[in-house]
Regions:
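C-terminal beta-strand-rich structural cap/linker in extracellular carbohydrate-active enzymes
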Residues: 501-529
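N-terminal catalytic cores of secreted or lumenal carbohydrate-active enzymes
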Residues: 75, 81-250, 284
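Aromatic/acidic polysaccharide-binding cleft in carbohydrate-active enzymes
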Residues: 352-425, 438-442
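Extracellular glycan-recognition/adhesion modules and their associated mucin-like linkers
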Residues: 1, 9-43, 55-72, 528-555, ...
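Structural recognition of the beta-strand scaffold that forms the well-ordered cores
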Residues: 88-96, 126-133, 137, 193-197, ...
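Carbohydrate-binding surface patches
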Residues: 439-479, 515
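Active-site neighborhood of glycoside hydrolase catalytic domains
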Residues: 229-236, 240-248, 258-363
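C-terminal outer-membrane/trafficking sorting elements
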Residues: 683-743
Length: 743
C-alpha cells in the first residue's frame, strides 16, 4: 500500500505503533497490515510504502523535536562468535548468460583483460560459472516475430540452439562466443567450477513454436512427447564439452524460474514454464539418460525466482519421489523473507543437500542501489547459508546496477563500475574454503580462513554516519591495531585502504561513513565449536532473526527483544537435579537476574515465564538440530519446545512452548542458537538511545568512556590507568553511574 494521501484517522490504515530498531532509530508499524513504513531507495523524493518487513535500513526512522534537528550518530554494538560456524563457503560466481555471448566476439586482448578482472584473486575472485545451453528459436520465425527479444532483454538474449529441427545433426560450431569466454575462464582459473543450465528447450519441441514460452505464460511449453529428446539434447551438450574440450560440468540444471508465468510467446528471452508435476516427470526421464552418459555431472534444480517458491518446490520434489535424483538445490533470491531463507536452509541441511544461491541482481540508483544488493547478499549468507553465491550479469550496456562492468558490446569498450568494488569487498577477501561465522548484527558478515588465523569482517552502512563497536572477546588471541588492514568503498572511494578504526582490548570500533561498505582483515587465534557448558553465560538467539535475543521482563514475561547483552538476556545452563553425568541435561536456564525459564504445560498452557521462585517445570533439554541451532524442549514434555508466537520474529514477540513434531518440516521458529559469552564478553557499548532528541538523550552503557556522539572511545577503563584522549566533553560510565567530564 502506497501512502500518498492522509486517510480517515479512524481506520487501522492510519494507525501506527513505534518500535525500537537500532540505536536512536525506530520502526513504524501500520496496524492495518502489520507491516512497516519504508522506502525502496535512499534517493531524495522516494515514495514511502507501508508494506516493508522492517529489516532494512530504509525501513528505519528518526524523530527530531527540531525541524533542523541533527540525526544522531548511531553505534551498533555486537559480538562475533568464531565457534559458531554457519557454513563452509565454496566461493563466488556469475552467469555467462548473456554477456559472454557478446564479449566472446571481442579481440583476444580485451577478452583476456575482462576475464582477468573476473577471475583474478585481486579482481572479483570468481570461480563458479553458469553456462547457458541455448534452445534456439525458429530460424524461419513461423510462430514468432523476428527478433522479438530485442524489445525485451535485447538481441543479446537471442541464444543459438545446436539443432534446427528434430533429427538434425548437432551444429557444434554454434555458440562460439560464449564457449570462448568459458574456455578462457578455465585457462585463467584452473579450479573453476561450471554448471550448465537451460532456460528453454529448442523451439520445435514446444507447444507455441516459440522458445520464449507458451502463448499462456502459466502453461507448460515443452510437449511431453519430447521429454526424452530434450533430455538427450541437454546431456549431449554436456558430453560434447567433456569429449571435445575436457571440460566437465559439475551440474546440469534443466529449469529456470519455471513455475512462474514469466515466459510467454514473443517474449523478451528464452523461457519455459513447467508445472511441479511436469518437473518431477522430466527429472525421472533425465536422470537415467545422464547416468548412462558416463559423465560425473549431477542434476541441480530448480532455480526459482524467490526463496518461498524454492521451499515449495523442494517439498514438491520430495513428495514426487525425485529429490534423491537431485545432487544440488539452486534458488534465486530476487525476493523472499529471511524466514523463507532459513526454511530453505533447514530443508537442505536435513537432507545434506548442497545449496547454491544461483542468481540475483538488483536495480536502483548509484551506490545506494549497490549497497542494497550488498544487504541482500548479507541476508543470503547469514540466513540462507549457501555454499556458493552467484551474480546474474557481469557486463551491461544500459545501466550500472545489474553488472560490475559497463560498456558497449559493439564498440568493445568497458570499465569497472562502483558495483565492482562493492562486490570485491566480499569476494576478494572471503575465499573458497572459508567458514562463515556468527556475528549478531545483520549489517555485518564474518568469515574465518581455513587456518583459523584470519578473521574477515565486512560491515555495511546504507544510511548516515555509523560506528560499529565489535566485541572480539571470544577469540583466543587478537592482533595489535597496526596489524589490522581495512578497505572501504563509498561514493568517493573504491576499495581504498583506510585507518578509521581503533582496537582497545577486545573492542574494535569502526567508522562507517554515509553509504559505505568496509572490510577488515584481522590476524587472530580462532576457536573451534564446543558443547554447551555450565557456568558460561549465553545469549539465546532465534534462528529467524539474529539481532534478537531471549529476554525476561521484570514481570516475568518472556519475549525476544533487540540484543543488548543485558542481565535479563544472559542465561546460564545449570545442571538440574537428576541430570545425566554426560552433560546432556536436563538444565535449568537462569539469567543473571536470577530469573528461571518456567513452562506451564502441566496445566495445558503454552505460556512461558521467567520467575525467581522454584517450579517443577523449570527443566529443559538443549538438543542440536541443525548446528549451530538447537531445540530447547521441556524436560517433562519433550515434544514441546520454545516457540516464537505465530512464527513472528520482531521485537516484542512472545516466546511460548509448542509442539515440535517430525511432520513439521520447517520448524525453524522453534530453533535457537546459544552464543557463549566467554572471557570478557559482557555488555558491548550503548544498549539503547531512549530520548528522541539529539540535544537530550539517555543511554544505558557498558563501563567505558563515550563522546557526545555516542561513540565508545575507551572500553572498561580502570580507575588507576592513564589514557590519552583528545580535548572535549565525555560521558564516563562505571557500575551503572554516568558522569559528564570536560577535558
Amino acid at each position: 500500500m502506497e501512502h500518498d494521501v492522509v486517510t480517515d484517522s479512524a481506520t487501522d490504515d492510519a494507525r501506527f505503533s513505534f518500535e525500537q530498531a537500532q540505536g536512536a532509530y525506530i520502526r513504524i508499524r501500520c496496524k492495518g497490515n502489520g507491516q512497516y513504513l519504508g522506502t525502496d531507495s535512499n534517493d531524495s523524493g522516494s515514495k514511502v510504502f507501508s508494506d516493508k518487513n522492517g529489516s532494512d535500513m530504509k525501513h528505519f526512522w528518526f524523530f527530531s523535536e527540531k525541524v533542523d534537528g541533527t540525526i544522531p550518530v548511531d553505534t551498533l554494538s555486537y559480538v562475533v562468535f568464531p565457534s559458531l560456524v554457519r557454513q563452509k563457503f565454496e566461493g563466488w560466481g556469475v552467469s555467462l548468460c548473456w554477456w559472454a555471448g557478446q564479449c566472446g566476439k571481442w579481440t583476444d586482448k580485451k577478452i583476456d583483460e575482462i576475464v582477468t578482472w573476473l577471475t583474478s584473486p585481486t579482481g572479483l575472485n570468481y570461480k563458479h560459472f553458469r553456462y547457458n545451453i541455448g534452445g534456439g528459436d525458429d530460424p524461419e520465425n513461423k510462430n514468432c516475430t523476428p527478433h522479438h527479444m530485442g524489445n525485451g532483454k535485447g538481441l543479446r538474449a537471442e541464444m543459438e540452439g545446436f539443432k534446427d529441427f528434430s533429427g538434425d545433426d548437432y551444429h557444434w560450431d554454434r555458440d562460439e562466443a560464449q564457449r570462448k569466454i568459458m574456455l578462457k575462464i578455465r585457462e585463467k582459473r584452473p579450479d573453476a567450477v561450471f554448471e550448465a543450465f537451460s532456460n528453454s528447450c529448442p523451439y520445435y519441441m514446444t507447444y507455441s513454436g516459440c522458445v520464449s514460452g507458451n502463448a499462456d505464460g502459466g502453461k507448460d511449453n515443452l510437449k511431453p512427447e519430447y521429454y526424452e529428446e530434450f533430455a538427450h539434447y541437454l546431456v549431449d551438450v554436456c558430453k560434447h564439452y567433456k569429449d571435445e574440450y575436457g571440460l566437465e560440468f559439475k551440474t546440469l540444471e534443466p529449469f529456470n524460474e519455471s513455475v512462474t508465468n514469466f515466459w510467454f510467446a514473443n517474449g523478451p528471452q528464452e523461457g519455459c514454464h513447467f508445472d511441479y508435476d511436469s518437473q518431477v516427470k522430466f527429472i525421472k526421464v533425465l536422470k537415467p539418460i545422464l547416468d548412462a552418459s558416463g559423465l560425473s555431472t549431477i542434476i541441480s534444480a530448480f532455480d526459482e525466482t524467490n526463496v518461498g517458491l524454492a521451499v515449495n518446490g523442494y517439498k514438491a520434489y520430495k513428495q514426487g519421489g525425485v529429490l534423491s535424483k537431485i545432487g544440488q538445490w539452486n534458488t534465486h533470491t530476487y525476493s523472499g523473507s529471511n524466514a523463507d531463507r532459513v526454511h530453505m536452509a533447514f530443508l537442505a541441511h536435513q537432507d545434506k543437500m548442497p545449496l547454491w544461491m544461483s542468481e540475483v541482481g538488483a536495480g536502483g540508483n548509484g551506490i545506494g542501489g549497490n549497497l542494497s544488493l550488498a544487504q541482500k547478499l548479507f541476508d543470503d549468507m547469514r540466513y540462507l547459508q549457501p555454499e556458493t553465491w552467484i551474480d546474474w550479469q557481469y557486463m551491461e550496456e544500459a545501466n550500472d546496477q545489474w553488472c560490475t562492468i559497463r560498456g558497449s558490446f559493439k564498440d568493445q569498450s568497458y570499465a569497472r563500475v562502483k558495483n565492482f568494488y562493492v562486490r570485491q569487498q566480499c569476494s576478494r577477501f572471503i575465499d573458497g574454503g572459508y567458514s562463515i561465522v556468527t556475528s549478531l548484527n545483520d549489517q555485518s558478515l564474518a568469515a574465518m580462513n581455513e587456518a583459523q588465523d584470519t578473521l574477515v569482517l565486512v560491515l555495511l552502512n546504507e544510511g548516515s554516519l555509523t560506528y560499529h563497536c565489535v566485541d572480539l572477546s571470544q577469540f583466543a588471541g587478537l592482533p595489535n591495531v597496526g596489524e589490522i588492514k581495512a578497505y572501504r568503498t563509498s561514493s568517493t572511494e573504491s576499495l581504498k585502504s583506510v585507518k578509521d578504526f581503533t582496537l582497545d582490548g577486545s573492542s574494535l570500533m569502526v567508522k562507517l561513513p554515509t553509504q559505505s561498505i568496509t572490510t577488515l582483515l584481522l590476524p587472530v587465534d580462532g576457536t573451534t565449536a564446543v558443547e554447551q557448558e555450565e557456568d558460561v553465560e549465553y545469549i539465546i538467539v532465534p534462528r529467524h532473526n539474529l539481532t534478537m535475543a531471549l529476554t525476561a521482563a521484570a514481570n516475568g514475561a518472556v519475549t525476544i527483544e533487540n540484543n543488548t547483552y543485558g542481565d535479563n538476556q544472559r542465561w546460564k545452563l545449570k545442571a538440574a537435579d537428576g541430570s545425566s553425568a554426560d552433560g546432556a541435561g536436563p538444565f535449568v536456564l537462569e539469567n543473571a537476574l536470577g530469573q528461571r525459564l518456567t513452562s506451564f504445560r502441566a496445566s495445558g498452557s503454552s505460556k512461558l515465564s521467567a520467575q525467581t521462585s522454584s517450579s517443577s517445570e523449570q527443566q529443559f533439554y538443549v538438543d542440536a538440530i541443525d548446528l549451530p541451532y538447537n531445540k530447547i524442549s521441556s524436560a517433562r514434555y519433550r515434544s514441546y519446545a520454545l516457540d516464537l508466537s505465530n512464527a513472528n520474529s520482531n521485537a516484542g514477540t512472545a516466546v511460548c512452548t509448542w509442539q515440535y513434531t517430525a511432520d513439521t518440516d520447517t520448524p525453524t521458529h522453534r530453533q535457537w542458537m546459544l552464543c557463549p559469552l566467554r572471557g570478557q564478553g559482557g555488555d558491548t557499548g550503548i544498549e539503547q538511545l531512549a530520548d528522541k532528541s539529539q540535544d537530550a538523550r539517555t543511554a544505558a552503557c557498558a563501563d567505558g568512556v563515550y563522546d557526545l556522539a555516542g561513540r565508545c572511545v575507551l572500553r572498561g577503563a580502570s580507575e588507576t590507568a592513564l589514557h590519552q584522549l583528545p580535548r572535549g566533553i565525555y560521558v564516563v560510565c562505571k557500575n551503572g553511574v554516568r558522569r559528564v567530564v570536560k577535558k
